[in-house]
């Protein structure tokens, strides 16, 4: 059976692995979107690192966890947010102001809502982590 939302499955797997204390998690299948989200997780300090492994099929990511994720998940449906509207989505998905990160896909790529606000651009909220 095909996976309808690979990003949601990947984030659910990360969340479950963190909650039971695993230090590594494999995400299959790999995609550019998942890679970009993992890059934001790495930049914000939620994971120690990750690498893409080409297995001749869709590939996979091997993620090194460090126990910094309390909860993460995909946002469905993908809400559009202007540069000045991120606070509304912070209140909905994050537990406190300036605690956690919204992952936003913009015309300039995937980034955290902090970077998007800094650059003055909006986009679609696709995930959250705290």
UniProtKB/Swiss-Prot annotation:
Part of the 30S ribosomal subunit. The keyword Mitochondrion does not apply. One of its GO terms (biological process) is translation. One of the primary rRNA binding proteins, it binds directly to 16S rRNA central domain where it helps coordinate assembly of the platform of the 30S subunit. The lineage of its organism: Archaea, Methanobacteriati, Methanobacteriota, Stenosarchaea group, Halobacteria. SUPFAM superfamilies: Ribosomal protein S8. GO terms for cellular component: ribonucleoprotein complex; ribosome. Keywords: Ribonucleoprotein, Ribosomal protein, RNA-binding, rRNA-binding. It comes from Natronomonas pharaonis (strain ATCC 35678 / DSM 2160 / CIP 103997 / JCM 8858 / NBRC 14720 / NCIMB 2260 / Gabara) (Halobacterium pharaonis). HAMAP family: Ribosomal_uS8_A. This is Small ribosomal subunit protein uS8. Belongs to the universal ribosomal protein uS8 family. One of its GO terms (molecular function) is rRNA binding.
